[in-house]
């Protein structure tokens, strides 16, 4: 696995040795960032942005954001093996000053933990078998941490049919292999 673009383009990052984490594939990550880059008027600009990466795993998405100019990424992860790899990746690229790791279940997120008023981009990548995505959308809406320019990106299994909460205004859906990427906003 490697960083796709930005200041750390081409740098390899570590992945877990066990099968319990499903790292976001390079191709899918690259496609997500191409969509963000080519829709700057519609979506947030990553430069100096604050990113919330829920179910961070190895941190590949958040690291990509920092590489492309984000000033801060808040990583939420509660699986110990993933946390170890995430910390190793941040140390490897010397990104600790740009990051905050919260070692908790993403469903227990609170305003006090993230300690910022507005988030520019929120990436939700729960386990594919997890069916509580709407609960997270509800929590995020209740916390009032998004603005009109904030972007929500959700990574799901395209084979799983879900009714996404009406609180998320979906602007785009793309399929890549087994992955479905949903782009939207919460007002």
Summary of predicted features, one role per range:
Residues 1-187:
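Class I S-adenosyl-L-methionine-dependent methyltransferase catalytic core
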């Amino acid at each position: 696995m490697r960083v796709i673009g930005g200041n750390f383009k081409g740098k390899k990052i570590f992945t877990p040795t066990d099968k319990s984490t499903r790292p976001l594939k390079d191709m899918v990550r690259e496609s997500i960032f191409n969509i963000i880059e080519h829709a700057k008027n519609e979506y947030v600009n990553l430069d100096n942005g604050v990113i919330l990466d829920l179910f961070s795993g190895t941190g590949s998405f958040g690291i990509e954001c920092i590489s492309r100019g984000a000033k801060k990424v808040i990583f939420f992860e509660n699986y110990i093996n993933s946390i170890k790899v995430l910390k190793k990746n941040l140390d490897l690229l010397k990104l600790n000053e740009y990051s905050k790791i919260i070692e908790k279940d993403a469903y227990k997120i609170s305003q006090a933990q993230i300690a910022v008023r507005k988030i520019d981009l929120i990436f939700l990548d729960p386990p594919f078998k997890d069916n509580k995505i709407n609960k997270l959308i509800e929590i995020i809406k209740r916390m009032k941490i998004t603005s009109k320019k904030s972007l929500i990106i959700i990574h799901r299994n395209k084979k799983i049919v879900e009714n996404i909460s009406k609180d998320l205004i979906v602007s785009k859906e793309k399929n890549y292999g087994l992955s479905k990427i949903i782009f939207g906003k919460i007002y």
